[in-house]
């Protein structure tokens, strides 16, 4: 298809109409049929590996010399990554079906029995950047939760995305489910994104997954409801009652296990009482692996720490850099974290249970941890299976967005002829 000949408004309307029809077909789909579709899609991915890698090579070639190595690495597929996508589909097939769960039930004095039951949201628009596997994961999660999905991946990954969608549609067809339950926007025209964001008639929810620029664009332009994931400016606060060795071990992992994920700690907040010992041990542990940028106190305590700028306190580095802030006690730490966190994930390191309770109550983030690495901010680590992202807002879903969060609910009211006076 020549995507440059497509009118974005008409194209999105056509995709939306087809997706809405498919969503109606998925509402009554059995768990067995959805699982079969996922297993068949996994098989199709494995069989299509040569074609998928060829398509991906075209995508990579189109950005070489224009994008940095980190971007190209996120875009690039190899046999191991394709196998990882296929395995992820099989794992999602093994998860419990979230649709049809009875969330609550109660009997009224007039004899009515009322049930609150989980149902699919309907049609989901997924807008993401360069990683092709996001399209596979999102498609699988939407399918298992009974939702149709319209994918709009980055233009750099368009050839890879089309191959992945073809495999998903093959799985749907094999299971007797609507093939249009998984579709991709076929044009690279950016106006298509704007059209998707205002397609209220056809799309029930839009989920962006990518950098701050993408998320802010969706937030500012969407009339469709959204699940937003802003950047992960995550904090690890070392309280005065922390075990220094334990705290340093946790903070090092929180920063360096994978620096490019949204759950990586970007800022270390340290109580003044414990700062001399903690900062020396932290600088030793990070030496050669991570640049530390600190406030005046931190710099005075260890000359391996360079002065931080005001921007450092609000920066998601996504690399081997961390800021270090020294505070006077728990109250100042709470005030500092609340003032600079992106409200994704924040942690306290302490052996004082009351201090931990106060911090975890006061910090208004989607995930708050005690004596654990912020890198555990992940749906898989929460036992939820795969995730479609981390929601940092407060409406509908918050934290890891897995199968359960991709459902809504409705009330089923059973009577025996009751009439209301």
UniProtKB/Swiss-Prot annotation:
Transmembrane segments: none annotated. Its EC number is 1.2.1.41. It comes from the Bacteria. CDD domains: ALDH_F18-19_ProA-GPR. Pfam families: Aldedh (PF00171). It catalyses: L-glutamate 5-semialdehyde + phosphate + NADP(+) = L-glutamyl 5-phosphate + NADPH + H(+). It is an enzyme of class 1 (oxidoreductase). InterPro entries: Ald_DH/histidinol_DH, Ald_DH_C, Ald_DH_N, Aldehyde_DH_dom, Glu-5-SA_DH, GPR_dom. Its main location: cytoplasm. It is found in: Cytoplasm. Keywords: Amino-acid biosynthesis, Cytoplasm, NADP, Oxidoreductase, Proline biosynthesis. One of its GO terms (molecular function) is NADP binding. GO terms for cellular component: cytoplasm. Pathway: Amino-acid biosynthesis; L-proline biosynthesis; L-glutamate 5-semialdehyde from L-glutamate: step 2/2. NCBIfam families: PRK00197.1, proA. Catalyzes the NADPH-dependent reduction of L-glutamate 5-phosphate into L-glutamate 5-semialdehyde and phosphate. The product spontaneously undergoes cyclization to form 1-pyrroline-5-carboxylate. PANTHER family: DELTA-1-PYRROLINE-5-CARBOXYLATE SYNTHASE (PTHR11063:SF8), GLUTAMATE SEMIALDEHYDE DEHYDROGENASE (PTHR11063). Belongs to the gamma-glutamyl phosphate reductase family. This is Gamma-glutamyl phosphate reductase.
